[in-house]
């Protein structure tokens, strides 16, 4: 249920703001796992 979206995140665990909603970076490669509730 986790969708990976390309983001400009550099640090691990950094919060991201995407059109889909608030995403939190949980990937080392800089990808974010977006979960919209």
UniProtKB/Swiss-Prot annotation:
The keyword Lipid metabolism is annotated on this UniProt entry: no
Keywords for the protein's UniProt record, in alphabetical order: Calcium channel impairing toxin, Ion channel impairing toxin, Neurotoxin, Presynaptic neurotoxin, Secreted, Toxin, Voltage-gated calcium channel impairing toxin
Protein task: Omega-agatoxins are antagonists of voltage-gated calcium channels (Cav). They block neuromuscular transmission presynaptically.
InterPro entries: Omega-agatoxin_II/III_CS, Toxin_34
Cellular compartment(s): Secreted
Keyword match Secreted: yes
Expression sites (tissue/organ): Expressed by the venom gland.
Name of this chain's protein: U1-ctenitoxin-Asp1a
GO terms for MF: calcium channel regulator activity; toxin activity
One cellular component (GO) term of this entry: host cell presynaptic membrane
Main localization category: secreted
Family membership: Belongs to the neurotoxin 04 (omega-agtx) family. 03 (type II/III omega-agtx) subfamily.
Top-level lineage group: Eukaryota
Pfam families referenced in this protein's UniProt entry, alphabetically: Toxin_34 (PF08396)
